[in-house]
Amino acid sequence: FGNKHPRDIDSAGLGDWVVNPKKLPDGIAGLLRDAAKHNIGFGIWIEPEMINTRSELYEKHPDWVMKVPGQDFITARGGTQAVLDLTNPQVRDFIFYTVDTLLARYPEIEYIKWDANMPVLNHGSVHLDKDEQSHLSILYHQGFEDVCRRIRRKYPDVTIQACASGGGRVN
């Protein structure tokens, strides 16, 4: 994934969920075709809650990362990874749109492994009012549940497995 900032290393391209034709000249359709040829169900591993500061998504929406208002934020994994702010409805819509586009375009996808490979290091949101900051964890989780419900409602037969040991998540 990623074209302007290809995901060749873990410090670039996360959040840019577009196929890189240099890596996959036949795109996801080519992978699906090969899987079908060998009678293998196809699954895809994505990390839609995370972003690299070296990504087109961050260049367009730097305000979408979780951070304490008025402060610099902490990055991890290659010095550029951050967590998208699911308290923000625009972020939730983007994540849903990303997954929806993938599944609508490639209905043969049977399985998603949903990674959240980074802990929340920045306990704040530029989207929330001052009096809502203490509810950040609850509101983030409610935002995550909202996205999952929307995906499940539209794609009830797709298996989705959460994977977050790197993020230390237990939800």
Question: Can you name each region flagged by the protein language model?
Answer:
Residues 104-106, 111-146, 158, 165:
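P-loop NTPase motor core
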Residues 1-97, 106, 110-111:
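Aromatic-lined carbohydrate-binding/catalytic grooves of carbohydrate-active enzymes
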Residues 1-2, 47-51, 116-119, 163-167:
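Active-site beta-loop-alpha junctions enriched in small/polar residues
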Residues 74-79, 125-130, 154:
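Short acidic (Asp/Glu) and glycine-rich catalytic loops that position anionic groups and cofactors
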Residues 26-35, 136-155:
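Alpha-helix-loop-beta-strand connector modules within alpha/beta enzyme cores
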Residues 52-61, 161-171:
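Substrate-binding cleft/loops of secretory-pathway carbohydrate-active enzymes
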Residues 43, 159-161:
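A structural signal for isolated positions on well-ordered beta-strands in alpha/beta enzyme cores
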